[in-house]
Curated annotation (Swiss-Prot):
NAD(+) binds at G51, A52, A53, G54, G55, I56, G57, D77, N137, I160, S161, N162, M271. It is an enzyme of class 1 (oxidoreductase). Residues 1-36 form a transit peptide. It comes from the Eukaryota. InterPro entries: L-lactate/malate_DH, Lactate/malate_DH_C, Lactate/malate_DH_N, Lactate_DH/Glyco_Ohase_4_C, Malate_DH_AS, Malate_DH_type1, NAD(P)-bd_dom_sf. The active site is at H220 (proton acceptor). This is Malate dehydrogenase, glyoxysomal. Keywords: Glyoxylate bypass, Glyoxysome, NAD, Oxidoreductase, Peroxisome, Transit peptide, Tricarboxylic acid cycle. It comes from Citrullus lanatus. Gene3D superfamilies: Lactate dehydrogenase/glycoside hydrolase, family 4, C-terminal, NAD(P)-binding Rossmann-like Domain. GO terms for molecular function: L-malate dehydrogenase (NAD+) activity. It catalyses: (S)-malate + NAD(+) = oxaloacetate + NADH + H(+). The lineage of its organism: Eukaryota, Viridiplantae, Streptophyta, Embryophyta, Tracheophyta. It is found in: Glyoxysome. Homodimer.
Length: 356
């Protein structure tokens, strides 16, 4: 027979779910008392998703709930967080899920987290470039990063909010102002460019995409996305026509999805998949796994620009090493110059947003 305290806890837990006060959110003292699983959750890392109710955030939350490295999953948004939290929390995996609604709960969502994933912001619409998103998303990223600087300055930050070429510099400037900036812990997520490159190259070569690795460097918009097809693994040769086709399709993959959805959304599902793939790499790095290498938009000395996307090795402190570009062919060298010219303006735009 179960001891009486256990029975009471179980009854309280059921009652909290059947009769939630307003919403099943972290602010509820009844739910906090009932959520005894959280005290002894599965070993792992604490992860927060900021923008968890959005088009990327929802599938991202679902996939992170499935990750065995996650012990606690915090879902934050300014709208609809209670519903997403309730839905995701029913999945029979180890991570304990907690929801947080609105600016007043941002600090609670962030406190004690190991990894912060930020897909918050408005999505792309037909005819809209990533730079068109700047005016709205820049302010959102600024506010969220101010919270991160205050509540979990040692967390690894995976920034998805577009335009990444500008929002990463914004985040860096916010952290600098707060005195918490660690360039090893701020990473712009460009994994979707790599995922697309692997997929499209595999189609041309007739291979399984899981067996293909294409380094994608530069940035995360248009011509700043530079796939290094000369460094594809397994080693492969391409005709000039194939190189032009692949480069163009990789650079414009986001537009391809926006147009195909005809106003109904952007690349939310593939982005969520790519974000989870990158987050998993960060968590494996935090765990101490060796040889965790992915591409990301980070503080860099690879070029004369202060930020650049290239391969990085991930570890317990975030970025352990930033790799050089390696040998480039003539087509890639020309593409690199175009990418740097475009990137310089985007980076300055982000820096100026905070400094001005």
């Amino acid at each position: 027979m179960q001891p009486i305290p256990d029975v009471n806890q179980r009854i309280a837990r059921i009652s909290a779910h059947l009769h939630p006060p307003k919403s099943q959110m972290e602010e509820s003292s009844a739910l906090r008392r009932a959520n005894c699983r959280a005290k002894g959750g599965a070993p792992g890392f604490k992860v927060a998703i900021l923008g968890a109710a959005g088009g990327i955030g929802q599938p991202l939350a679902m996939l992170m709930k499935m990750n065995p490295l996650v012990s606690v999953l915090h879902l934050y948004d300014v709208v609809n967080a209670p519903g997403v939290t309730a839905d995701i929390s029913h999945m029979d995996t180890g991570a304990v899920v907690r929801g947080f609604l609105g600016q007043q709960q941002l600090e609670a969502a962030l406190t004690g987290m190991d990894l912060i994933i930020v897909p918050a912001g408005v999505p792309r619409k037909p005819g809209m470039t990533r730079d068109d998103l700047f005016k709205i998303n820049a302010g959102i990223v600024k506010t969220l990063c101010e919270g991160i600087a205050k509540c979990c300055p040692r967390a690894i930050v995976n920034l998805i909010s577009n335009p990444v070429n500008s929002t990463v510099p914004i985040a860096a400037e916010v952290f600098k102002k707060a005195g918490t900036y660690d360039p090893k812990r701020l990473l712009g997520v460009t994994m979707l460019d790599v995922v697309r490159a692997n997929t499209f190259v595999a189609e041309v070569l007739g291979l399984d995409p899981r067996d293909v690795d294409v380094p994608v460097v530069g940035g995360h918009a248009g011509v700043t996305i530079l796939p290094l097809l000369s460094q594809v693994k397994p080693p492969s040769s391409f005709t000039q026509e194939e190189i032009s086709y692949l480069t163009d399709r990789i650079q414009n993959g986001g537009t391809e999805v926006v147009e195909a959805k005809a106003g109904a959304g952007s690349a939310t599902l593939s982005m969520a998949y790519a974000a989870v793939k990158f987050a998993d790499a960060c968590l494996r790095g935090l765990r101490g796994d060796a040889g965790v290498i992915e591409c990301a938009f980070v503080s860099s000395q690879v070029t004369e620009l202060p930020f650049f996307a290239s391969k990085v090795r991930l570890g317990r402190n975030g970025i352990e090493e930033v790799y050089s570009l390696g040998p480039l062919n003539e087509y890639e060298r020309i593409g690199l110059e175009k990418a740097k010219k475009e990137l310089a303006g985007s980076i300055e735009k982000g820096v100026s947003f905070i400094r001005s």
